[in-house]
Amino acid sequence: MVISGSRDNSVMLWDIRSKTLEPAQCLNEAKDSVSSVRVSDHEVLTASFDGKIRRYDIRVGELYTDYMGDAVTCASFTRDGQCIVVSCADGVVRLMDKDSGELLGEFTGHVANNLCLESSVDTQDTRIISGSADGKLWIWDLVSQKVVTRLSGFKPTKHPIVSLSVHPQTNCFLATNGPSILMWNTTSMQE
């Protein structure tokens, strides 16, 4: 399966073995553009500018929704699958309990400027990483919620860092500000 989210408010599941150009399933619950899609085992997690994160359990066909109060630019699972990291247009990254929806932490300081910023956890589930409009990567301790570091390996830093990807097993991640892509080691935070 390939899963896509779109500005037309839909999430489509495509069977790549099929000879048809039609999606196998279309999920139309979002009321505004779908900003991110993440998949973990049997769950599909979507974020939308309608202010909601939606978690589809495709094993049993159930939908779980949490309202965040502002447009959601990115949502991702923690590595242990127990929590969800949520970036919102209000400039706050939130850590939510996946099952109860309880707010476990808020991470602030980075600059959102209404950009569609991505955030994630590191490989060990100990740090929150987020892009920022100030051209830096902001990293917080997951438990204390304090800023660990701000990485600024991009020269010049006039471009916002909007996209990042954490390697699922190795202690490294990639980030881009548009014209450049850099890789960091999360253990030493060296470029």
Language-model features, listed with the residues they occupy:
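Short C-terminal beta-strands that terminate individual repeats in beta-propeller domains
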Residues: 5, 23-29, 63-68, 103-110, ...
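Structural hallmark of WD40 beta-propellers
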Residues: 1-3, 42-45, 62, 81-85, ...
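Canonical WD40 repeat/beta-propeller blade segments in eukaryotic WD-repeat proteins
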Residues: 31-39, 70-77, 113-120, 158-165
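Blade-level signature of beta-propeller repeat domains, shared across WD40, Kelch, NHL, RCC1
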Residues: 162-191
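Loop/turn-rich, solvent-exposed surfaces of beta-rich toroidal or solenoidal domains
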Residues: 87, 91, 102, 110-142
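WD40-repeat beta-propellers
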Residues: 11-16, 53-57, 93-97, 137-141, ...
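Short coil turn/linker residues within repeat-based beta-strand modules
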Residues: 18-20, 60-62, 100-102, 144-146, ...
